[in-house]
């Protein structure tokens, strides 16, 4: 137990640096806050809405045009009744104004910043400066293209979105344990390979030399 505690303490400083690095790799802004569940209400709402959309279109197989028209009709009737009741002063709450319904420029700016960030990252990967990252991107895209043959586009997007919303949070919560387990597995694998080399690989040239002398 003492060894485990010492090795866990040894990884804490590097773990905090990796956590900050992962947060900044995701943009370090609102998108990263959502992925790391900094605002649990907002992250939970987005996940719930995306899950509802996936359930309606993939499980229930609800027609998209029908769904869109019914949502618009629902909003029209809600605002119509709300405006009528608000004007007759039956309730104190007034319907939202047109300015309340407009999408703010900051939201559009956030969206376009994320698109620009993605384009810049894609360009950096394609330049070949980091061959390891380039290889990882090519393999990941190839795996996604193969997996896409077995899932619909919406299901695949849902799986990717759920992964993006859960993996960073779980990694941040159990990072020390995962880092310790990964480093310990790496050391054990290295010892096993060294043992295999010393007992099997290193004996092959000796066996070849003996056969040559006997010949």
UniProtKB/Swiss-Prot annotation:
Residues of the Reticulon domain: 31-211
Topology versus the membrane = Multi-pass membrane protein
GO cellular component terms given for this protein: endoplasmic reticulum membrane
List the Pfam families.
Answer: Reticulon
Q: Which residues form the signal peptide?
A: none
Listed GO biological process terms = response to bacterium
This protein is called Reticulon-like protein B14
Q: Which organism is it from?
A: Arabidopsis thaliana (Mouse-ear cress)
């Amino acid at each position: 137990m003492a060894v485990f505690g010492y090795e866990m303490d040894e990884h804490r400083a590097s773990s905090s640096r990796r956590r900050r690095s992962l947060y900044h790799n995701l943009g370090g802004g609102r998108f990263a806050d959502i992925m790391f569940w900094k605002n649990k209400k907002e992250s939970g709402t987005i996940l719930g809405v995306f899950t509802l959309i996936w359930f309606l279109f993939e499980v229930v197989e609800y027609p998209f045009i029908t769904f869109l028209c019914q949502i618009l009709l629902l909003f029209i009737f809600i605002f119509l009744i709300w405006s009528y009741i608000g004007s007759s002063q039956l309730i104190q709450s007034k319907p939202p104004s047109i300015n309340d319904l407009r999408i703010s420029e900051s939201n559009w700016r956030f969206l376009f910043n994320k698109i620009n960030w993605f384009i810049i990252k894609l360009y950096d990967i394609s330049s070949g400066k980091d061959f390891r990252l380039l290889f990882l991107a090519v393999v990941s895209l190839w795996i996604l293209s193969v997996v896409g043959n077995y899932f619909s586009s919406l299901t695949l997007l849902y799986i990717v979105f759920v992964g993006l919303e859960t993996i960073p949070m779980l990694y941040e919560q159990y990072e020390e344990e995962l880092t310790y387990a990964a480093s310990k597995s790496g050391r054990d694998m290295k010892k096993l390979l060294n043992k295999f080399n010393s007992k099997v690989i290193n004996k092959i040239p000796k066996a070849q030399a003996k056969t040559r002398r006997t010949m």
